[in-house]
C-alpha cells in the first residue's frame, strides 16, 4: 500500500489529501481493462443537492432558535459521550460538526463542515501569528443568492467540485489511460436546474429531483436506495497497513521540513492513537504531505 500511495502522490504533482483518490485509482485501473472511456456521476450532489451538509445548512436556523441552555447541554453533555469512529461510522463526527458549526456565522459554519483543519489548527500547525485565510468562507459570503441552499451549492460548484472531485477523478483516471465523461455537468443541465426554486430542487428529499427523473429509467430499488458515500476504510488503513509508515515518517524532522509545528502535529497523532475522535483525514493529509516531500 505504501508504494501505491507514493504512485498516487506523484500522479497529482502536489499534496492532495482526499483518500477517495485511492479508490478512484483502483476503479479506473479495473475499468481500463475493458473500456477506454467511462461515464461518471460527478456533479450529481452539487447540482441536485445530495450532500447531507445541505440538510444541515437548511435546519441550522431552526437549531439556533432552540434555547441557549439546551444547545449548551448538547455541546457540553451529549457530544463528549458520542464515541467517534474512523472505521466507517461517521454520524457521531457529523453531529459534533453540526452542533459546533451551528454556533458560528453561516459562512464559517459551512467552511467548518468541508475543511479538514479548523483555522485554529492551521494557525498552530503553521505557527502563524494571525488566523489563516478561509477561502470557502469568502466564496459563501460572496455567492449571488440569499437562499441557504443556493449559497451552499454555488460555493461547492466553485470549490469542492473542481478542487476536489474533478481533480482526483482526472488525475487518477488519466493515470490509467481512462477518459471520463461527466454528463451531469453538462452546462445546459447545470444552468437549467440552477434556475429552479430551491423548494423544487429538494422536494421529496435531497436529490429528489434527480430521483424523480430517474424513475422512468431505473428500477425502484436503485432510485430509492439511500445515499452511500464512496469512502475507503481510512481509519483501518492508518492503524494497520499504514501504521508503520506513520510512525517512521511523521516525525519532528519531517514535519519541520514541511514547515509544520511538531507539538501541533503530535496533538493530532495523540488523538488518533486514543481513538476518541475521528481525525483520520487529518492524519492522512499529514502523511500525504510527507510523502509528497519525499517523492518529489
Write out the residue ranges for each language-model feature.
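ATP-dependent adenylate-handling active sites, centered on carboxylate activation for C-N bond formation
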Residues: 1-133, 171-217, 273, 277, ...
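N-terminus-centric sequence/structural signature that marks the extreme N-terminus
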Residues: 5-13, 35, 130-136, 248-259, ...
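Hydrophobic (often cysteine-bearing) scaffold residues that line and stabilize catalytic clefts
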Residues: 19-23, 149, 153, 157, ...
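N-terminal glutamine amidotransferase
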Residues: 24-28, 84, 101, 225, ...
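Short amphipathic alpha-helical segments and their helix-coil junctions
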Residues: 133-148, 194, 258-276, 296
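Short, hydrophobic/amphipathic alpha-helical patches that form generic packing surfaces
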Residues: 155-163, 282-295
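PAPS-dependent sulfotransferase catalytic core
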Residues: 218-273
Amino acid at each position: 500500500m505504501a508504494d501505491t500511495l507514493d504512485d498516487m502522490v506523484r500522479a497529482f504533482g502536489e499534496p492532495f489529501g482526499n483518500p477517495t483518490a485511492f479508490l478512484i485509482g483502483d476503479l479506473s485501473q479495473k475499468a481500463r481493462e475493458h473500456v477506454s472511456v467511462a461515464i461518471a456521476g460527478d456533479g450529481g450532489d452539487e447540482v441536485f443537492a445530495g450532500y447531507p451538509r445541505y440538510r444541515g445548512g437548511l435546519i441550522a436556523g431552526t437549531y439556533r432558535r432552540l434555547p441557549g441552555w439546551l444547545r449548551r447541554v448538547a455541546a457540553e453533555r451529549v457530544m463528549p459521550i458520542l464515541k467517534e469512529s474512523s472505521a466507517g461510522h461517521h454520524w457521531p463526527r457529523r453531529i459534533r460538526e453540526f452542533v459546533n458549526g451551528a454556533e458560528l456565522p453561516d459562512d464559517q459554519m459551512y467552511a467548518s463542515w468541508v475543511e479538514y483543519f479548523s483555522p485554529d489548527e492551521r494557525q498552530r500547525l503553521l505557527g502563524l501569528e494571525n488566523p489563516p485565510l478561509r477561502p470557502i468562507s469568502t466564496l459563501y459570503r460572496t455567492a449571488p443568492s440569499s437562499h441557504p441552499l443556493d449559497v451552499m451549492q454555488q460555493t461547492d460548484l466553485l470549490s469542492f467540485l473542481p478542487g476536489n472531485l474533478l481533480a482526483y477523478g482526472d488525475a487518477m483516471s488519466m493515470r490509467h489511460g481512462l477518459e471520463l465523461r461527466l454528463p451531469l455537468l453538462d452546462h445546459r443541465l447545470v444552468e437549467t436546474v440552477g434556475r429552479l426554486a430551491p423548494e423544487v430542487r429538494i422536494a421529496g428529499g435531497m436529490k429528489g429531483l434527480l430521483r424523480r427523473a430517474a424513475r422512468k429509467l431505473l428500477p425502484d430499488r436503485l432510485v430509492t436506495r439511500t445515499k452511500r458515500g464512496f469512502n475507503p476504510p481510512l481509519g483501518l488503513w492508518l492503524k494497520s497497513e499504514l501504521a508503520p509508515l506513520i510512525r517512521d515518517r511523521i516525525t519532528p524532522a519531517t514535519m519541520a521540513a514541511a514547515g509544520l509545528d511538531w507539538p501541533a502535529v503530535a496533538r493530532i497523532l495523540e488523538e488518533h492513537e486514543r481513538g476518541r475522535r475521528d481525525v483520520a483525514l487529518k492524519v492522512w493529509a499529514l502523511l500525504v504531505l510527507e510523502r509528497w516531500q519525499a517523492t518529489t
